[in-house]
């Protein structure tokens, strides 16, 4: 086992804070409508230009082990916020840096870190409740477009595309983002279905950049039991291999020898296959397999109806134009099923909804209707160059997550104003002792920080703008894009409540952990000794005699 360096107290915290500052300073330049770009080096190909906080954070790895620990903890804030809310990563990083910076001053002054943490938690709890009160539901397509535009760094066209896509497939519908072929963004609605099961083995992945399996015009084998013996599958696999097309297996489970053989065939390029578990459980699983069968024009191979795997033919398999399988989701696009059969199935499920007694059953049945009838909207991102395409695509994906979050939990005024207004709930808050009060003060100060950073990135004087916004009431704030003050909701500067809430909670959680850290253990740098000098060549003596 390698030797470790053990560092205690202020020395450990100071190094970790340095790491936090390096990462946060790199990320926070991207905040707001006038945020700057960050250029990321790639080991091959051109560099990537981005204004996405989490993309910047993910690239940062520091040489100093202790600094790197601090940076990685804040990176966790950004990626957790991105996973939960899909946006707000830069805001979360700015909040975390502020809480750590202010908190360290109090820790250095001898206050109890655990009480500071309790004060911080108390203040964040009150602020989150206040944010929920400030929140209002998104009702119009215009509001959805505004949320999308703000999240895409004030690009109104992206917001409009997303609002249009949500109109087409409904708020519960599936929307994906692809590379376009032209300079303009395009929207295409494709019949399709998504379910929450991912690939059974990462070895099926054939698009490493997106970490997904993409199958073009595949066959779909639907089986309601476990597959563990490859012999059962061989007849079907041989027929599919002859047809020269990929195969997706959807079964209760594919395990052991069967899964291993599929993986080996895939890696060797003999037969392009993928396997996923069937969605749902019990009777619902059977019903959902039947839905997929109708959508793809196949048959569920079940012993109840006298079908076995060994006797399955290509006629029993479903087909689709394209299937995309991620770690947690599978999307079937353009199934080859008969339109009238799909319509009949939807009517049948709607009749079941009418008769359903429990809310849970009703909700699950409605989900099935949406999957069969809703389709998938594809936003094709247009750009002049590949570098611009990647950057724009990342912004569209961010905006899509933000609009989903807005539909889910509502919206609050953007531009850092919601956090300023939520301070009202904390202003009168008191802890059980002075140290907890200091924790509350830390959060009060941190909640100004996103607005300060937006203003700084816009090249204005932060303290003047913050003071003026604090004087105002309600939605009154500063629109950094136009440099005007006014009602931000009317101006269309909106943030999803979920994004703001998640950013604050995650930032406080990780920052509190750092304040209460008193020891850091890291691997000692290896001392590499210089290589020995090579020996001289033999037989070189007696050169003088040759002169």
Swiss-Prot record:
It catalyses: ATP + H2O + a folded polypeptide = ADP + phosphate + an unfolded polypeptide. It is found in: Cytoplasm. Forms a cylinder of 14 subunits composed of two heptameric rings stacked back-to-back. Interacts with the co-chaperonin GroES. Keywords: ATP-binding, Chaperone, Cytoplasm, Isomerase, Nucleotide-binding. The gene is groEL. The keyword rRNA processing does not apply. SUPFAM superfamilies: GroEL apical domain-like, GroEL equatorial domain-like, GroEL-intermediate domain like. Its EC number is 5.6.1.7. GO terms for biological process: protein refolding. It is an enzyme of class 5 (isomerase). This is Chaperonin GroEL. Together with its co-chaperonin GroES, plays an essential role in assisting protein folding. The GroEL-GroES system forms a nano-cage that allows encapsulation of the non-native substrate proteins and provides a physical environment optimized to promote and accelerate protein folding. NCBIfam families: GroEL, PRK00013.1, PRK12849.1, PRK12850.1, PRK12851.1. GO terms for cellular component: cytoplasm. ATP binds at residues 30-33, 51, 87-91, 415, 479-481, 495. The keyword Nucleotide-binding applies. Its main location: cytoplasm. The lineage of its organism: Bacteria, Pseudomonadati, Pseudomonadota, Betaproteobacteria, Burkholderiales. GO terms for molecular function: ATP binding; ATP-dependent protein folding chaperone; isomerase activity; unfolded protein binding. Belongs to the chaperonin (HSP60) family.
